[in-house]
Each structure stands twice: as C-alpha cells, then as structure tokens.
Regions:
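C-terminal catalytic lobe of FAD-dependent flavoproteins
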Residues: 305-403
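N-terminal Rossmann-like FAD-binding beta1-loop-alpha1 element of flavoenzymes
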Residues: 17-43
C-alpha cells in the first residue's frame, strides 16, 4: 500500500487506528514502519507542513557505534546494520540513503591519552565492537596527515559515518504504507479509567487504544496533555557549515575531540561543524525557530583547529558569505539516553523520545524495540530505555553518556 502524506480534509479523517504516532520526524517515521511490520494500522500526526522539518534536518546526520556502554553500542550497531541494507530490509530495493562510511575518528591531545583510549577501545571490544581500532598519534597522522602533531592517540571505526536524514525519514514513511497527516496537531488525549481511548487533534478525533509520543523537543508538552511527566529538557545546539574550501580534505572521517567534543565532517566540497560545549545552554521552552548565536562558527573553527590545524588556515581565507550557522533543540534526558516504552501512567500511551542528539543514528533500533514492546515481543521490566528507570535514585546521579 502506498504511503499517503497529506493535509487531511474532514471527510477523510479516519474514525480509528490501532496506533497513533505523534511526530513526523525520523523517529516517528521509523516507529510507523516497525509498528506496521508488527501488524498495526498506524496514523502519524505531524503539526508542520512536511515530515522531517524540525530537529531531523538540523542534525549532522551522522551515526556511530563507538559508545562506551554495551547497551548503547548494541542499539547503534543495530541501526547501522539497518542503514547498510536499508532498501532490502524495508522493502524498497535500490533506495538511496546517500550512505557514506568514511568512519568516525576520536582523538586525544592529552599526554597520557593513549591509556585512556586503550581502555575505551577495550571496553568497546568487550561489548562486541571488534572492528574499532586503537592508534597511536603517529599511526593516526600516518592515516590522516592533517592531524595536529600533539595528537597522542585515536580510536577509529570505518563503518561509522553519515547519511541523508530526509531520505531516511521518507524511506521509513514510504515503506510503512501508512497514513501521515501533516498540518495536524495533537491537542489532547481521550482516556477512561487510566486507559487511552483516542487522540484529540486540531482536525478531528481518532479512536485508538495506543499512541506514541515521538515529538522530539515537544515530547514533554505532548505527554503532559495526558498527565504524563517526562524528564526531557529542550536545549539549544548549533551547527555551522562551510559551503566550499580547497583545503578541506574530502576523505576525512567525522573527527571528534575526546577532550572538548568539538567535531567536524566533510560535506561535498565543504564541511559541517558541531560543538555542544561552545556555550552554557540552559533548558528552554520548545520552539520551531531557534535563534543561532552568530559567534558559533568562529568558536567551532577555533576548537577543531586545535586538533586539525588546517582549519586555522581555512579561517584566515574564509569569507562570511561562505559560512552558515543554524540552531535547533536537543531533547535531553538526565542520562542522555532515549525514553522508549510505556508511559507508566496511561495504559496504551508510549514514548519514543529523548534521544539527546542521537535520534538519526538511533531511530531504527529504537523504533524496532518500541514496536516489539507494544505488541508484547519484549518485556517492559527488562527494557533498558524504560521511563521507570528514572524512579531509581541512582539514575538521578548517573553521569551523562560519554562521547
């Protein structure tokens, strides 16, 4: 069945669905796909005029399995394996995600960084990530001569990389065969005796025994309509772009400083930059139009030039017309892991949000897990991403997921 993405008219608004997904970004579209594969009739609601037009398009569109925790590694490996065989897995032979796998390179400039990277890689290999490599600074510069002379060690995995998030979103949507309503906002929930009975929208009501909040930085506000409190904080994050420059190595991997978190990757003849620590960013109310700080490109360029000095040369010859800067919102949780599973307050209401900047890379595995939870193929009490984990006092003190 062909996917139908449209603004609904009163006469074609469905009376009921097995599942309503609130949010038409990459996570919502992936949720629709896996739920449809589980046999559910799905309706997706997106209040904006098109899918994937908010946080999905403000990302660096990257993916990696190089985390430190086995749970995170397993999740991202599953997503990456899906991306690598996307057309085959979702039933769209030849579908192009613009998949690039030049790798992810984590570097350290600390004198004792070699031991820290070795421990990091050992933990990753113990978690099943056997193809991550540990390099000395010399080995890293032999592979990538543009690295700083004081880079003391590095970790590299070739199968990490990036893709086109717009194509990923629409691929999931198309493969789902489900109905997607744009310009349609969820404004409330119908419940009775603690159970979900339907979703109230700006264009009509739909009866449904199940719904998923996949609304990114708006997830907290949407869940609150049902009396559910989510520990999700919208926090501003920037990305800067350079349209083109002859000094940018086009074969560079995504390169990340283990000390600062500053990172860059090539994009055609140009590049993208990110750096979560450029500014102190308090939580804010979710909004579609997030103002960018014009100082970010200069700060990010300086940060990446510390481990890749050619960026200093780029900065010397760069024209302002060749630089872009945008801002969006991360949906941060206390432990920087997503909330995937039952709401715990309203039976039939589920959450797939809080990816904390990793929504593109985690979308496939997270949505697959949620679909399995909804239909009973997985148990909520053994789900590591369940909302109830924050009821444990130890969770409040847990440090955020490392790079």
């Amino acid at each position: 069945m062909a996917t139908r993405i449209r603004t609904p008219s009163p006469e074609d608004f469905p009376a009921r669905a097995d599942l309503v997904v609130i949010g038409g970004g990459v996570v919502g579209a992936a949720t629709a796909f896996y739920a449809s594969r589980a046999g559910l009739d799905v309706l997706v609601l997106e209040r904006r005029s098109a899918l994937a037009t908010l946080t999905t398009t403000r990302s660096l569109e990257a993916f990696r399995a190089q985390f430190e925790d086995a749970t995170d590694i397993g999740m991202m490996r599953e997503s990456i394996e899906t991306f690598e065989r996307f057309g085959e897995i979702v039933g769209l032979p030849g579908y192009d995600l613009s998949l690039h796998q030049p790798g992810y390179l984590f570097v350290t400039r600390e004198p004792d960084g070699g031991a820290k990277v070795a421990a990091r890689v050992a933990a990753q290999r113990a978690a099943g990530l056997h193809d991550v490599e540990h390099w000395t600074g010399h080995e890293a510069r032999r592979r990538f001569p543009w690295l700083s002379p004081d880079v003391s060690a590095a970790a590299f995995r070739q199968r990490d990389g990036w893709l086109a998030s717009h194509e990923l979103t629409y691929g999931f949507a198309r493969a789902s065969g489900m109905l997607f309503f744009v310009e349609t906002e969820a404004t409330g929930f119908a419940t009775a005796k603690g159970r979900l009975e339907g979703v109230v929208t700006s264009r009509g009501d739909v009866r449904a025994p199940r719904a998923v909040v996949a609304a990114g930085p708006y997830a907290g506000k949407v869940a609150a309509l049902a009396g559910v409190s989510l520990p999700i904080s919208p926090v501003r994050r920037h990305r800067a772009g350079i349209k083109a420059h002859e000094l940018i190595p086009r074969d560079a991997p995504m390169t990340v400083s283990l000390e600062t978190g500053a990172h860059f990757r090539p994009e055609g003849p140009g590049a993208w930059f990110g750096w979560s620590n450029a500014f102190e960013e308090p939580p804010r109310e979710p909004t579609d139009d997030v103002p960018a700080n014009p100082l970010f490109p200069a700060l990010a360029l300086d940060a990446v030039s510390q481990f890749a000095p050619f960026w200093g040369d780029v900065a010397q010859t760069l024209k302002s017309s060749n630089v872009t800067v945008e801002a969006g919102l991360y949906d941060l949780t206390p432990d920087a892991r997503p909330i995937i599973g039952a709401s715990g307050t309203v039976e039939g209401l589920f959450v797939n949000s809080g990816y904390s900047g990793h929504g593109v890379m985690g979308s496939a595995a997270g949505a697959r897990r949620l679909a399995d939870l909804i239909v009973g193929r997985e148990r909520e009490d053994t789900n590591p991403f369940r909302l109830a984990r924050f009821d444990d006092p130890r969770a409040a003190a847990a440090r955020k997921r490392p790079l």
